[in-house]
Amino acid sequence: MSCTLLKGVCTMKFLMMIVFLQVSACGAAPMNDSEFAEWYLSRFYDYGKDRIPMTKTKTNRNFLKEKLQEMQQFFGLEATGQLDNSTLAIMHIPRCGVPDVQHLRAVPQRSRWMKRYLTYRIYNYTPDMKREDVDYIFQKAFQVWSDVTPLRFRKLHKDEADIMILFAFGAHGDFNYFDGKGGTLAHAFYPGPGIQGDAHFDEAETWTKSFQGTNLFLVAVHELGHSLGLQHSNNPKSIMYPTYRYLNPSTFRLSADDIRNIQSLYGAPVKPPSLTKPSSPPSTFCHQSLSFDAVTTVGEKIFFFKDWFFWWKLPGSPATNITSISSIWPSIPSGIQAAYEIESRNQLFLFKDEKYWLINNLVPEPHYPRSIYSLGFSASVKKVDAAVFDPLRQKVYFFVDKHYWRYDVRQELMDPAYPKLISTHFPGIKPKIDAVLYFKRHYYIFQGAYQLEYDPLFRRVTKTLKSTSWFGC
């Protein structure tokens, strides 16, 4: 019998064992303080009455006291070896299910992935939150680690990924059962094949994106740290500290220790190409008939593509810079026909004819270009005239001749019932469109030497401008 819940194969006998474990765990009698402390030390500090020493040693050692001292030292408590109130209080704080001390025979030292490009898949979703919120939270959690390393992550919607993400109750097939609300919140496995690298979250918790309940983003960043090879830290400022505490996700930053530890495994991020070398624009800079092939934001800048080069500038700045496409991205061809950015992911997509390229943090991704037909276009489409990403709707609009297509970024699928006529659904806009820019909740639709400022909320054109107005011409 195949098992799709976890990587690998499980038998009926194994499933029955899982059920038995879950019933046993749920039906266990409440523990007193001493029993709870022994359970805690057994689970997180490798304590066990039947532990066989790896080396010859005295048989009258007090292993329980030694493990209590080890736990107290880890959390910065006075290492008395006594089960006092401060020690018990720490033990009762909700925490990660990964041990603080790894047994020498159980975990390879400095486990890491031996590749830069990793895949992940959210196997199922918690009912506590909207599906799109869960997708966004994990995308941001992975970005926390990709921002400080050369690692890159890609989401899969089917098949087995390097990192499988699962929400589950109680016993769920890995002999590391969840204990209900509070207690252990989640656990993850160090890098490797099979279940290694996976992250599991206790569905008994109330997962949220705020300070109420348990904040999914904070726990996800922590567990993905394990999935990438990090162990627990005894630094309370580290996201890899074992116990849970709320931090504001909008201002969250990795500690210096976290950055140093993850970079000791994977190195620093690949330095993006420099865009700080301005040069004088050509004489056609403010030509009255100047048009653009593609226009998009790239971070805080705006890129204006034309033939083999592009202008770039900061909105509001008098300076305008120009450089050749090949000087920044030697693998990208000239004559880009459409472009859009997903700023939250630091991703730039470039289109020419039947192919498209992905630029991640200004670095071209391998295994590109890809076919535009993989996005869901029909065979009749031979090129994309213009494209724009609307962050409020999380949709990409592709303009092709008299029609437009709409692509769902979260689902990574073309929306059904498309294409539709541009003139019908964008009143005041007539084909053909050269480029589209999203800026301050408006679309700027470039057609030859002019651009139309379009309000997508009220579906109307609000201004007509020269295409070169961005340059102060």
Curated annotation (Swiss-Prot):
Ca(2+) 4 binds at residues 293, 385, 434. GO terms for cellular component: cytoplasm; extracellular matrix; extracellular region; extracellular space; nucleus. Its cofactor is Ca(2+); Zn(2+). InterPro entries: Hemopexin-like_dom, Hemopexin-like_dom_sf, Hemopexin-like_repeat, Hemopexin_CS, M10A_MMP, MetalloPept_cat_dom_sf, Pept_M10_metallopeptidase, Pept_M10A. Binds 4 Ca(2+) ions per subunit. Binds 2 Zn(2+) ions per subunit. SMART domains: HX, ZnMc. Residues 1-28 form the signal peptide. Hemopexin repeats lie at residues 289-332, 333-379, 381-429, 430-473. Glycans are attached at residues 32, 85, 321. It holds the Pfam family PG_binding_1. The keyword Zinc applies. Belongs to the peptidase M10A family. The conserved cysteine present in the cysteine-switch motif binds the catalytic zinc ion, thus inhibiting the enzyme. The dissociation of the cysteine from the zinc ion upon the activation-peptide release activates the enzyme. This is Macrophage metalloelastase. It comes from Mus musculus (Mouse).
